Design a protein with these regions (language model features):
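Long, charge-rich, low-complexity intrinsically disordered regions
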Residues: 1-100, 126-140, 144, 148-152
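Short, composition-biased local secondary-structure segments
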Residues: 85-88, 96-106, 187-208, 328-332, ...
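Short amphipathic alpha-helical interface segments
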Residues: 94-121
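Short, proline-centered helix/strand-breaking motifs
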Residues: 108, 403-409, 639, 656
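Short, basic interhelical loop/turn and adjoining N-cap
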Residues: 123-129, 716-718
Length: 748
């Protein structure tokens, strides 16, 4: 949701040079990529030198998107994109894959078809085009998002199955759009009366003048390769780079000396470096130690930040770290708190002009979302899923749960059967903390038009996170909006404090800073205090790696349970936790997993049917078009030339597990069974058939009688064909002979 003021790491305040531009347009990316790739797309007709240059450029684009420069992703290996790892085929595949990625990134507003790729790549690589294109499409690397041109590519009929998605946040919305494009039936159940989840843009103001205020996730953290940047480009929404200048002020309102500020920042970063060295030495022992305790011991060991002003400055950096992790340093794992650092998105941190609701609104378009549906029970099994929300039951083939980790920790949803123990343990181990805000709309910008952030020190360490950082949203919100952040221990006490008291304290801080400068701080027109920890649909802000946890716990949360229950959300992504783009990417990931699960199930059914269709299958189908005796699921055929009651015939029992699923109203049933009608056979005498007909109680009782009293065993078509070939042949011959005689009699 929130991010620290940093460029490349959550460890440090940004030291980047100030940008000369206040705003920039992501649409310029189209021109940049086009310039590198050339004006024409006729790759086949390029010179060797041109092709080599383009291949290098496309490789760099792929690297910026997280692909290895000369290897396959683990997902690609699992998907079997090439027949043999290593060698020429893999190298050729990588070139084709990179070309497809670059082509789509060149214009993310247009659907990239497989046919378009075939126009620019030699025919000899057609099989690699299909392999790479299908992988990139189904795993959400191309053709994702909200471009209006994509709607025409959604199948008219949803034949892939049905999915219930719990939660209309970024994860749920991303998954829903992907699944619809794959041909699934989808509904979203959302407990709130709005979409977005922890991304919440509130409109405040008066007399028709309203502004956008971000009460939840606010900053796009690193624009390079960020899927939210792709959405912004598709919607032609400009982004505002968060400028680097972040002056700090003492508790009395006077500015912090810049030299002292730099000195303490160096101390802070060196302490973190020492933590890294120490945990390497300690090995597994660091697993049980908090980051806060190690930092404090090192501070005392090196005798740094001993006077009040230096300690307050160091506390400010600690508060910034607690903001980045939504947790107190005393809770963060010294061993793994920064395990996601290698995966951080590059580039500037940005605000979205007009607020993040613009992304949410676009993602919601065309999706069936049911608001006010707080889910309390999820039942899942071999036959599908049932989701209970209040007094309503919803049925589908699969369910995707995207609720926040805080909701899972509170056991607000009952799972039947219970989740696997390893997943429950991961839910318990991972941390889920707080970040709160005071959002204020003022009559005018008094803090300076050229300032996006400024910070304030606190006298007491336990209050270091209280109003420690201010964000000015006047550049993107449509008005003079200022937001004060509350992190760490202060965020917890904030939850039970009186809003008017909190506002007075914020104004006191602001007036302490600006009054000595001769600047009057007016009362806000309107203000809002968040309470994310008390919100029953989140119970917190975002996740972190707590003591005795590790990054692998994110992987455990992401694991599906069988092929019916799936999980997404920021707390299910090891690489991008606690970020908006992480939530979005997890939705794309789970859409791919659901699609793959269906493919596996369909392949299983196809192989099962093929296995049970023997050479006599056509004969069996012919015989049972007109059975001699039929009741319920039971059909019988006999040799009409043999009247003996002990003579043998064939019995077919047809199992159709989709019976009863029906096409009920959407609110009560949303299932489209994968299962096919399954005919099974056995031999049976005329006498036994009539015995079976007399059994009362319906088909279940007849089946029980057939097995237990008559001792009959059902077989597939192939088995019965091998076992009863002569019997089948005799009955067919009799039927055909009878038909020929009848034909001759009926002729004039």
């Amino acid at each position: 949701m929130g991010t620290p003021v940093s460029n490349s790491s959550v460890l440090k305040r940004s030291l980047r040079k100030k940008s000369g531009l206040r705003n920039y347009d992501e649409n310029l990316m189209d021109e940049v990529i086009e310039k590198h790739l050339g004006a024409t797309l006729k790759r086949k007709s390029r010179t060797k030198e041109d092709l080599e240059k383009e291949t290098e450029t496309e490789a760099m684009i792929a690297v910026s998107l997280g692909f290895p420069i000369d290897a396959l992703l683990e997902e690609e290996i699992r998907a079997g994109v090439v027949k043999k790892l290593g060698g020429k085929e893999q190298n050729d595949y990588i070139v084709v894959r990179n070309h497809i990625l670059a082509r789509w990134r060149g214009n993310v507003r247009m659907w990239l078809s497989k046919g378009q790729i075939k126009e620019t790549v030699s025919n000899e690589y057609e099989h690699l085009i299909s392999s790479a294109y299908d992988f990139l499409l189904h795993n959400g690397y191309i053709n994702f998002g909200v471009s209006p041109s994509f709607t025409s590519h959604v199948p008219d009929e949803a034949n892939e199955g049905s999915v219930i998605i719990i939660g209309a946040g970024l994860a749920g919305l991303a998954a829903a759009r992907q699944l619809l494009s794959f041909g699934f039936k989808v509904i979203i159940l959302e407990g709130r009366n709005r979409p977005g989840g922890r991304v919440y843009t509130q409109r405040i103001g008066q007399e028709g003048k309203y502004v956008a205020v971000e009460l939840g996730g606010s900053v796009i953290t690193g624009i390079h390769a960020n899927p939210l940047g792709v959405l912004a480009r598709q919607l032609t929404i400009p982004l505002h780079k968060v400028r680097d200048n972040c002056p700090l002020y003492k508790p009395d309102g006077s500015p912090v000396d810049k030299e002292l500020d730099s000195k303490v920042e160096v101390i802070f970063n060196k302490l973190l470096d020492k933590v890294m060295e120490l945990r390497q030495i300690m090995g597994g022992f660091a697993y049980d130690i908090s980051l806060g305790s190690v930092l404090e011991r090192l501070r005392k060991l090196y005798a740094v930040a001993r006077n009040d002003e230096e300690r307050q400055l160091l506390d400010w950096h600690h508060a910034n770290l607690e903001y980045a992790n939504a947790g107190c340093l005393s809770e963060l794992s010294a061993a793994y708190w920064d395990q996601d650092d290698p995966y951080e998105m590059g580039g500037d941190h940005c605000f979205l002009a007009g607020g993040n609701w613009r992304l949410i609104k676009a993602l919601c378009e065309g999706l069936p979302i049911f608001y006010g549906k707080t889910v309390n029970t999820i039942r899942y099994g071999n036959e599908g899923v049932e989701v209970i929300a209040g007094d309503q039951a919803f049925h589908a083939d699969m369910v995707l749960c995207t609720v926040p980790l805080g909701v899972l920790k509170k056991k607000a949803i009952k799972f039947e059967p219970e989740l696997p123990q390893r997943k429950l343990a991961a839910i318990d181990r991972l941390g889920f903390g707080l970040l709160n805000k005071v959002a204020m709309l003022f009559p005018h910008v008094f803090w300076g038009e050229d300032l996006d952030t400024f910070g304030c020190l606190n006298e007491q360490s336990h209050k270091r996170g209280e109003f420690f950082l201010f964000y000015g949203y006047h550049t993107v919100s449509g008005g003079p909006v200022l937001i004060a952040l509350v992190a760490g221990e202060a965020a917890e006490t904030f939850e039970c404090s009186d809003p008017s008291s909190l506002l007075n304290r914020v104004l006191s801080v602001l007036r302490g800073i600006y009054s000595p400068k001769g600047v009057t701080v007016p009362n806000p027109i309107q203000s809002i205090c968040t309470r994310w920890g008390s919100d029953p649909l989140s119970y917190g802000s975002y996740s972190h790696v707590r003591v005795r946890s590790s990054g692998s716990d994110y992987d455990l949360l992401a694991e599906s349970v069988g092929t019916r229950l799936f999980f997404a959300g920021e707390a299910t992504t090891r690489q991008y936790p606690a970020t908006m783009h992480g939530a979005f990417l997890s939705g794309l990931r789970e859409a791919a997993r659901i699609y793959q699960a269906v493919r596996v199930r369909q392949n299983y059914h196809r192989k099962f049917v093929q296995k049970n269709v023997g050479p006599n299958n056509d004969m069996l189908a012919y015989l049972f078009k007109k059975p001699d005796l039929e009741f319920g699921k039971f059909s019988f055929v006999f040799d009409s030339l043999v009247e003996d009651t002990r003579s043998m015939g064939l019995l077919r029992v047809t199992f159709d597990t989709s019976e009863g699923s029906g096409q009920e109203d959407l609110g009560t049933s949303f299932r489209d069974s994968f299962d096919l009608p399954l005919p099974l056979y056995t031999t049976i005498s005329r006498e036994q058939a009539h015995e079976l007909e007399q059994v009362a109680g319906g088909d279940e009782c007849r089946l029980s009688y057939m097995v237990n009293s008559l001792g009959l065993k059902l077989m597939g078509p192939s088995a019965v064909g091998n076992f009863c070939n002569s019997l089948i042949t005799n009955i067919v011959s009799t039927r055909r002979g009878r038909g020929r005689n009848r034909l001759f009699v009926e002729q004039p």
